């Protein structure tokens, strides 16, 4: 192996593929667990990921490359105008709680306060439309976005009804195409579960 490296021989490729999914479970009640789950993921995962990728384009435009699968249900949550409006209130509630901590806990909260404020500023800069930032990264060539089964259904269990499997995949492809104006380059199989003859 060392000889191969010193002779500059091509050894292969490494692909980093992230999988992003949340179920589309909505409740009308205020402060529902499902909304909290989505907002926390936006705060701690999706905004930071988009920001790091945007920064990588500035620093090394030719070297930045990543693949992510965005499930149709997660995309639908990103597209929800109601959730886009609720996120600032959700994060401001947490900021107020951090500001009310006793003095001896203040040092620990400063990092969280700054992080939450930064993420909220980013959210507001783009009017809560994080999905458009993913589109920007896709169009820039630094990010490949693939799809997943429409409802993240476990396909090996669904194979008894082939129409269901086909429906899951075709619906996901249509949803991806209508969102990003391109067909997905691939699909992430839910739970990485494959069965023989799954190829469609």
Please provide the spans of the model-predicted regions.
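Carbohydrate-active enzymes and regulators
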Residues: 1-200
